[in-house]
Amino acid sequence: MAMLPPPGPQSFVHFTKQSLALIEQRISEEKAKGHKDEKKDDEEEGPKPSSDLEAGKQLPFIYGDIPPGMVSEPLEDLDPYYADKKTFIVLNKGKAIFRFNATPALYMLSPFSPLRRISIKILVHSLFSMLIMCTILTNCIFMTMSNPPDWTKNVEYTFTGIYTFESLIKILARGFCVGEFTFLRDPWNWLDFVVIVFAYLTEFVNLGNVSALRTFRVLRALKTISVIPGLKTIVGALIQSVKKLSDVMILTVFCLSVFALIGLQLFMGNLKHKCFRKDLEQNETLESIMSTAESEEELKRYFYYLEGSKDALLCGFSTDSGQCPEGYECVTAGRNPDYGYTSFDTFGWAFLALFRLMTQDYWENLYQQTLRAAGKTYMIFFVVVIFLGSFYLINLILAVVAMAYEEQNQANIEEAKQKELEFQQMLDRLKKEQEEAEAIAAAAAEYTSLGRSRIMGLSESSSETSRLSSKSAKERRNRRKKKKQKLSSGEEKGDDEKLSKSGSEESIRKKSFHLGVEGHHRAREKRLSTPNQSPLSIRGSLFSARRSSRTSLFSFKGRGRDLGSETEFADDEHSIFGDNESRRGSLFVPHRPRERRSSNISQASRSPPVLPVNGKMHSAVDCNGVVSLVDGPSALMLPNGQLLPEVIIDKATSDDSGTTNQMRKKRLSSSYFLSEDMLNDPHLRQRAMSRASILTNTVEELEESRQKCPPWWYRFAHTFLIWNCSPYWIKFKKFIYFIVMDPFVDLAITICIVLNTLFMAMEHHPMTDEFKNVLAVGNLVFTGIFAAEMVLKLIAMDPYEYFQVGWNIFDSLIVTLSLVELFLADVEGLSVLRSFRLLRVFKLAKSWPTLNMLIKIIGNSVGALGNLTLVLAIIVFIFAVVGMQLFGKSYKECVCKINENCKLPRWHMNDFFHSFLIVFRVLCGEWIETMWDCMEVAGQTMCLIVYMMVMVIGNLVVLNLFLALLLSSFSSDNLTAIEEDTDANNLQIAVARIKRGINYVKQTLREFILKSFSKKPKGSKDTKRTADPNNKRENYISNRTLAEISKDHNFLKEKDKISGFSSSLDKSFMDENDYQSFIHNPSLTVTVPIAPGESDLENMNTEELSSDSDSDYSKERRNRSSSSECSTVDNPLPGEEEAEAEPINADEPEACFTDGCVRRFPCCQVNIDSGKGKVWWTIRKTCYRIVEHSWFESFIVLMILLSSGALAFEDIYIEKKKTIKIILEYADKIFTYIFILEMLLKWVAYGYKTYFTNAWCWLDFLIVDVSLVTLVANTLGYSDLGPIKSLRTLRALRPLRALSRFEGMRVVVNALIGAIPSIMNVLLVCLIFWLIFSIMGVNLFAGKFYECVNTTDGSRFSVSQVANRSECFALMNVSGNVRWKNLKVNFDNVGLGYLSLLQVATFKGWMDIMYAAVDSVNVNAQPIYEYNLYMYIYFVIFIIFGSFFTLNLFIGVIIDNFNQQKKKLGGQDIFMTEEQKKYYNAMKKLGSKKPQKPIPRPGNKFQGCIFDLVTNQAFDITIMVLICLNMVTMMVEKEGQTDYMSFVLYWINVVFIILFTGECVLKLISLRHYYFTVGWNIFDFVVVILSIVGMFLAEMIEKYFVSPTLFRVIRLARIGRILRLIKGAKGIRTLLFALMMSLPALFNIGLLLFLVMFIYAIFGMSNFAYVKKEAGINDMFNFETFGNSMICLFQITTSAGWDGLLAPILNSAPPDCDPKKVHPGSSVEGDCGNPSVGIFYFVSYIIISFLVVVNMYIAVILENFSVATEESTEPLSEDDFEMFYEVWEKFDPDATQFIEFCKLSDFAAALDPPLLIAKPNKVQLIAMDLPMVSGDRIHCLDILFAFTKRVLGESGEMDSLRSQMEERFMSANPSKVSYEPITTTLKRKQEDVSATIIQRAYRRYRLRQNVKNISSIYIKDGDRDDDLPNKEDIVFDNVNENSSPEKTDATASTISPPSYDSVTKPDQEKYETDKTEKEDKEKDESRK
């Protein structure tokens, strides 16, 4: 930074020939120097270009304005980095920086040539880029034309001309490609170049397929990216995330290939099995028909087709596959389904099928086809693929994209910090120039009394050096004048203005939390708490949550944009408390660098007297938007002269805009202020003006530049929008204000909103006229109410104030629209205006925090997503145009291939709109069906390429980036810190008032009753009197909410009396977080102890709020209820503390009844010391022991499992299986008795109190009740009653009892229960959000989905045949096959609308709804094809907002909840520093390993050679390559290959079998019996044996078992082994590691999901077993048996195909179904469904499984992925330790865990980095000071520990963790102690170590002596003798010091590198002493 020229106007210098000469001179100097300094450069990084002065950025504002003559002129480069590079810059009017190369462009135009200068001027002009932008947009519009008229050709030439002109200008200005900053050096220009070249090519050269080349023109749309500034960065981020995705992509492709191979082997040719007619004519055979048939069409008559399906019915040859109907048999013939594109016949198609499975697009169809053709057992294949492939891989992509985004974000934050620093440095430079002035100011201040006054300490800039302001002094004077006038006029207006600007006293009180009523008192209190702090540091103690935020002049520039978004929807009057340092309107934007405490005004150290001590400026914004900087509150002087601030927590915000007099008076009343006469003191005035004013002016200028409107607008507003005409009016206004602002009015309005919403939701089709009228009147009434509210508010607040509040603007808009709609009600086609009424629903957000938060999150994300949305729009546009250009013609020409009527289908690419819809559909994840059409009409390759690109770029990358952004705006702060507005508080105040009123009425009633019915007891008077004062206080507290107390000053004034409460209040008010948490839950009254884990007031000190005894009692109660007695395995729920003290006698039961019961009914008290009581107590103790026994629990679990299993047998075939039915009936009774017995035992053992306070016990109790009731009913013979039957279905809940018994599931359930409140919240918000769309749908489509159909083939009559309902009914009378039919899922009322929307949001069944909507004409009119085409837009908007945002909110909420619960459970991680974590993790890995005994090398020479070969790494890799080759040959296989090919593949396979057998044999020879000690070897052996057997018995095995080729596929798993050897595969290893880490959690979630599926399957069987077979329900997929139900439910788990299963259940009456239909073998009649049950069943299942469980799965993966990436970035990974031990095995073949010292050097050199210590390494190793044992041996852990320490570096953290580590090792590796050969005593060890040290010392000493002797220098003997003992003493001292057990080694870390002994000894010795003690004990015992 030091190199930067001083910023300001004079830093701009024209670029002249001298400048160029100077640069050349510098370059030559550098070159001369360069030869000398070449070496230096390698080590040090050179200077970097300044990030603020990059080309394309705005000029930093510190440089001020550009002097007039310098705009668009070449200037010398400002960036010192380019001082020796040939560059210059040009600045345009907008201060954008353009950097050019100073070498001649095109070798002839120097920077000074007029042509180049003109080109530069044109290039940098803003109009130039505008022109290009407009051209591109116009061009895009022309590109969307599907059949352009002829004249467009000329337009095309114009475009090309403009682009050519643009490129020419750029080339002339910049040069072509030689040197930096030339035309082709910018990749975006390549795009232009390519576009222009292609434009000329297509024009002048005839290249055949022009349309393909024309599509290149689409790339012009990409140019928008290069023109709009923000887009480049987003595209950068996208490209970054695509790079990051490479690993995931490789892994995905690999996994899909493996699965595709398995699919190929399992299902090859299966999808061609079709049902073929048996009754053929005589000369026809299957072969002859197949050979003669020209096309599929001819074969159609031989195959069996289901109604409405395009493909023939599939069937299979196995028993559990699909069967053919009568008269048909199963054959393999014809083509595959879906135009032949769905199959597993070749590797390619199988891969496509699996990619489709992974993206879950229409996969239910593939699933059903495959299961029908191959058999139901293959469901397992799909389960694995969906869970591993789909959920895991897709979410990994999400995780990676999210991480890339997160990193990008972090980088941006870092950059911002960096800039802040740079600006600070610039400021410091400015300040240095002012120091003299400062000194004068300080001197002048000394004679002014401090207590009375202080001047603004703002001295950022002085008049001499203010480069920040380049405006004239005259302007400044004018502004000052205006300001004075304004202030004085403000004072004249006086009282009039009071009300107008800020409302009543009360509202002001609400707005400014002013706790400093007794300033001195508070100050003294604070002083006591912080006696040693300097005056300036006090602020830190007061505002502990917020470190002092530096007010940087520049901060508004960087963060200005974000400010709006945060409070966009918050009520502006009451923006967030934390930002009370003024918001929006003010210049000083609080920026909080977390760790930095610096005083606000940087000259603090120099002039303390002039400072506002609390380091805070009060900047109020007056009505003009001008910031008046008012000083902070005055300092209070304490007797010792220390300054203390008074605490003002106030807020200046944009809407109570202004330094209104009242506000100022309010402040003056409580704090000393700059008095008027002081300002008149000439000296002071001058000083204040000269210093502060200049800056203030600059500040004002900046402020003005940020004002939303020009100054004249403010003048106008003041004149016309503030109504203060007469005193009567003002009184009236006050009265109105009092009414309108009352909380009750708010409550009333909220109730009106809810009612209005209800009225709107009551619309339906068909409605009676009376009902219509009621709704119409209701609408009028509500419109009236809302209009009245608006008018009254306008009167009360004045338009100026009214329109400053976001909500008011919103209200006024809606009211206006409602009124407009009333007048235009009869105008046809304006019914859409009605939907604007729906927006009223959003007014609820005011008082509903979560809705507010959701809107805010959407608002913020849309803001943040602005650029991304643009990019997405550009991508969609480009692909839509590409599709149209490439495939449009083909759709038209080949339409007959895909549509029998040769009409264009709904999804085509013939025009832009339809093309856009297809691309949008692909983005929604639905690509496969439209792609089949495309491939059929336009050829496979192009379609595949385009679709895959849209899928990967659009869906996987961009949409995941969307999601990542959503998740990031979902940080827990958003969820917990929802800023609430006063209105929210108003509601709560109103509710609190009502509660108080009710309490008051209750109280008076109670007192009245007591008075009238009871005589006063003696002494009551006295007690009452003494209790009274407290009582009053307590009532006050308990009946009011904290929020109110905080607002009630009178209460606070009594603070001395209730110090306990108010001190806690003070605390909470001092801390921002606490304040926030207050607001969240204002309904909590103070005296209630808050249960942990549920409170929002986490940060508040609950102990202070509740009395101690109270909290102790509650703790005790909690502990008792939390641990469940219903199962012995149960632990307390997460978040609850463990009991502090165990009950005294753990094996005794607790009391039966609660204390309350015993008090009321004394008979419940039993004396247990005598008589019957004692017997009873013994019985209870016995029961208690039985129940607590572990076997009892196991038995109950077994019973639960058996009884649940029994339910699975009760399917529709139970009537036919009499024996099973009888067994089940008895079993049912037995289970019921057992469970009743269990319940009774528990009642006796635990007592009712314990039993019924446990949730799990309640569950058991209810389920037992159900069984009991059904049992009794059966006995009495009422089993066929309806209610009893439905009760029986509740038995399906039995498996729920298993929940509390299985640890893993309970963990998940607890996590879920924790998340339920927030999930419900989001669900509610979603419902509100959807309600709007639903009501809108009802308005648009109610009653329009009816159509007249021909019932024989289900086709719709055309409009020419039937135009409307009446015609249809007329036709019905003629023919019986006609029906006027409604779509089952429609918008006839809001409920059905919700169902439709759910189908659209899950993309299942949405096509039918959309088609019906698009075809709809009018109520009772016959639909017309695509009549209402633009209704598609309704669905597009809903999908974006309803589906995209709201459904992903679920993921957000769940992930967020996981994190919060982790915090609550608080593992050790939270308390560890980063450094500690590193060590901890390394040690964790270290501790888990120990050296293995390697397989010994055989003695035999021959075997030895083979052993060397087999154990070589190269051998492993060779085998891996062979495995991969084997896979490739398997991929080549395909269905129906030629005999020759089969023959070749057979022999290739034989070769591979021989090779693998060879490997097996070689290993067996060399490894002998050790071969079977390795798991992989056993696996290989099995595969080889199976392959050999398979070769000979292939036919037989395939018949009875699975095809043996499958095992070869499993071999692929061995590839996992080479990943470790490939250094580049680190990313993939991380991903697999993440999977391994998440497996346990995923298993638990899987279990829970299975349980849910099980219960739903039982329910489904009992409710839907007999529904009509249509849509998704058929002979294979139904609810008839348990297995079938599970198959159906598995597919709905991903929400696939639930619409098909629901459709038949919605049939409720004829003619849809037949209620009298007889089912043979069963007593059930009819095949109608129960719509309400069906809808509830499927919707609840989807919410539970799809939204909750599956999202938990996602949460776990995201979590583990981030953990795994952290692990992979750590310096030492698992692999490094593995590698250490692998090398170790070679040096320690017997696994003694020791190594000789002499081998150590070789060993260290043999390791891989990072542990490697290359030779020469002796010195380093000796320096490590490794402890040795006898025989000069060193233990492996000692070495590993030392090496690890070397990698991680020395640090203090090591010491803090040292003892833990040692214990860990000892427990993980007990062998360490047992292998220690020195087992005698501690002393022995010390001597041993000492001996080695002495030897070393002695050798050294001898060596020195020899040297001395040789050099023949004479030394006296005595000297030498004296020398030795000293040395010895020192050595011994050293040793003792190191190893004495008493001495702690706390100091070790402070002395530079601690010796290893000092790190590890004490613990080791501990273990040794333990060991010796143990041995002594053993000896003693043996003696005995």
Curated annotation (Swiss-Prot):
<feature type="domain" description="IQ">
    <location>
        <begin position="1887"/>
        <end position="1916"/>
    </location>
</feature>
<feature type="repeat" description="I">
    <location>
        <begin position="112"/>
        <end position="410"/>
    </location>
</feature>
<dbReference type="InterPro" id="IPR044564">
    <property type="entry name" value="Na_chnl_inactivation_gate"/>
</dbReference>
<feature type="topological domain" description="Extracellular">
    <location>
        <begin position="1662"/>
        <end position="1684"/>
    </location>
</feature>
<feature type="transmembrane region" description="Helical; Name=S6 of repeat IV">
    <location>
        <begin position="1732"/>
        <end position="1757"/>
    </location>
</feature>
<feature type="transmembrane region" description="Helical; Name=S2 of repeat II">
    <location>
        <begin position="771"/>
        <end position="795"/>
    </location>
</feature>
<feature type="region of interest" description="Disordered">
    <location>
        <begin position="1015"/>
        <end position="1039"/>
    </location>
</feature>
<feature type="transmembrane region" description="Helical; Name=S4 of repeat III">
    <location>
        <begin position="1286"/>
        <end position="1302"/>
    </location>
</feature>
<keyword id="KW-1133">Transmembrane helix</keyword>
<feature type="topological domain" description="Cytoplasmic">
    <location>
        <begin position="796"/>
        <end position="804"/>
    </location>
</feature>
<feature type="topological domain" description="Extracellular">
    <location>
        <begin position="888"/>
        <end position="914"/>
    </location>
</feature>
<dbReference type="GO" id="GO:0005272">
    <property type="term" value="F:sodium channel activity"/>
</dbReference>
<feature type="topological domain" description="Cytoplasmic">
    <location>
        <begin position="1758"/>
        <end position="1984"/>
    </location>
</feature>
<feature type="transmembrane region" description="Helical; Name=S4 of repeat I">
    <location>
        <begin position="211"/>
        <end position="227"/>
    </location>
</feature>
<feature type="coiled-coil region">
    <location>
        <begin position="402"/>
        <end position="449"/>
    </location>
</feature>
<feature type="intramembrane region" description="Pore-forming">
    <location>
        <begin position="347"/>
        <end position="363"/>
    </location>
</feature>
<feature type="compositionally biased region" description="Basic and acidic residues">
    <location>
        <begin position="1960"/>
        <end position="1984"/>
    </location>
</feature>
<feature type="repeat" description="IV">
    <location>
        <begin position="1495"/>
        <end position="1793"/>
    </location>
</feature>
<feature type="topological domain" description="Extracellular">
    <location>
        <begin position="1597"/>
        <end position="1605"/>
    </location>
</feature>
<dbReference type="InterPro" id="IPR027359">
    <property type="entry name" value="Volt_channel_dom_sf"/>
</dbReference>
<feature type="transmembrane region" description="Helical; Name=S3 of repeat II">
    <location>
        <begin position="805"/>
        <end position="821"/>
    </location>
</feature>
<feature type="transmembrane region" description="Helical; Name=S4 of repeat IV">
    <location>
        <begin position="1606"/>
        <end position="1625"/>
    </location>
</feature>
<comment type="similarity">
    <text>Belongs to the sodium channel (TC 1.A.1.10) family. Nav1.7/SCN9A subfamily.</text>
</comment>
<feature type="region of interest" description="Disordered">
    <location>
        <begin position="458"/>
        <end position="540"/>
    </location>
</feature>
<dbReference type="InterPro" id="IPR043203">
    <property type="entry name" value="VGCC_Ca_Na"/>
</dbReference>
<keyword id="KW-0472">Membrane</keyword>
<feature type="topological domain" description="Extracellular">
    <location>
        <begin position="1211"/>
        <end position="1222"/>
    </location>
</feature>
<feature type="topological domain" description="Cytoplasmic">
    <location>
        <begin position="848"/>
        <end position="864"/>
    </location>
</feature>
<feature type="transmembrane region" description="Helical; Name=S2 of repeat I">
    <location>
        <begin position="151"/>
        <end position="172"/>
    </location>
</feature>
<dbReference type="GO" id="GO:0033268">
    <property type="term" value="C:node of Ranvier"/>
</dbReference>
<dbReference type="GO" id="GO:0007623">
    <property type="term" value="P:circadian rhythm"/>
</dbReference>
<feature type="region of interest" description="Disordered">
    <location>
        <begin position="1089"/>
        <end position="1145"/>
    </location>
</feature>
<feature type="topological domain" description="Cytoplasmic">
    <location>
        <begin position="228"/>
        <end position="241"/>
    </location>
</feature>
<keyword id="KW-0813">Transport</keyword>
<feature type="transmembrane region" description="Helical; Name=S6 of repeat I">
    <location>
        <begin position="377"/>
        <end position="402"/>
    </location>
</feature>
<feature type="transmembrane region" description="Helical; Name=S6 of repeat II">
    <location>
        <begin position="940"/>
        <end position="966"/>
    </location>
</feature>
<dbReference type="Pfam" id="PF11933">
    <property type="entry name" value="Na_trans_cytopl"/>
</dbReference>
<feature type="topological domain" description="Cytoplasmic">
    <location>
        <begin position="1626"/>
        <end position="1638"/>
    </location>
</feature>
<comment type="subunit">
    <text>The Nav1.7 voltage-gated sodium channel consists of an ion-conducting alpha subunit SCN9A which is functional on its own regulated by one or more beta-1 (SCN1B), beta-2 (SCN2B), beta-3 (SCN3B) and beta-4 (SCN4B) subunits. SCN1B and SCN3B are non-covalently associated with SCN9A. SCN2B and SCN4B are disulfide-linked to SCN9A. SCN1B regulates channel inactivation. Interacts with NEDD4 and NEDD4L; regulates Nav1.7 activity most probably through ubiquitination and subsequent endocytosis. Interacts with TMEM233; modulates the gating properties of NaV1.7.</text>
</comment>
<feature type="transmembrane region" description="Helical; Name=S5 of repeat I">
    <location>
        <begin position="242"/>
        <end position="267"/>
    </location>
</feature>
<dbReference type="GO" id="GO:0050965">
    <property type="term" value="P:detection of temperature stimulus involved in sensory perception of pain"/>
</dbReference>
<feature type="transmembrane region" description="Helical; Name=S1 of repeat I">
    <location>
        <begin position="126"/>
        <end position="145"/>
    </location>
</feature>
